[in-house]
Amino acid sequence: MPSVSNISVGANFASNFAHKARHEMNASIMRLSSGNRTIMGGDAAGASVGNNLMARGKSHYMAARNAEDGISALLTAEAIANEIASLAYRLRELGVQADNDSLLSANDELALDKEAALIGDTLQDIEVASKFNGQTLIATGSDTTFKIGTEIDGVTAATTITTFDAFTDATEGIANASGADATADLLLADVAITLGHIAAGISSLKARQNIAYATSANLEAAAARIMDTDFAKETANLTKFSVLNQSAMAMVAQANQAQSAVLAVLQ
């Protein structure tokens, strides 16, 4: 083979291979340090699928958190309903006691009437003032809607649960103890219906929450299987291309030394 001095063919080839090896080394270093195998052009299609799965997984997790907020609201409503029931118990006692008016003095009847009226005012205050995070829990004919689904194609899944029936308007007219026992019975009937709605709502939300948590975990696991770095494989690649880079650089030096032999002929 003739010696030519105008171009170092071997050195150029070796330099090119060294460049490729360094590129692959850098890619392996980035994948190992980031934990993401799809970067540096590793898998564009996988990145697209993985990102979509991860986004949906996180959305389902947030849906589960929304369900938890709904459960908290319903538990608050349950406590309010039970307190209303306690007031209804006392209201019924007052009504029954007031029925025995033949043995009550005028002052006794006045005391009973004042307590009954105060309970009526308290019930009205509870209806208006009972809130969860600023949202009214008890209002006439109110339905509470909990959005616990995920947005798919622009549609958000939701569930509407009637948490409270309208508490009887009779509470607005409680001015005395007479007949308060009948009003208490109406209140207790509403409380019973309300507690049934609450229990059903909590069961529904817990079921949806469990599904949302499970879906989130599986979607994020699927995304991880696509996008996460295979550390064993990538470490082997880093070692391989590190050796190739060192070998190529050594060959560049060897090729350059071979070219110097041409000059030796001229001396």
Go through each PLM region and give its residues:
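Surface-exposed loop/turn positions within long extracellular repeat scaffolds
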Residues: 106, 231-237
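Amphipathic alpha-helical coiled-coil/heptad-repeat segments
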Residues: 1-23, 27, 31-58, 64-216, ...
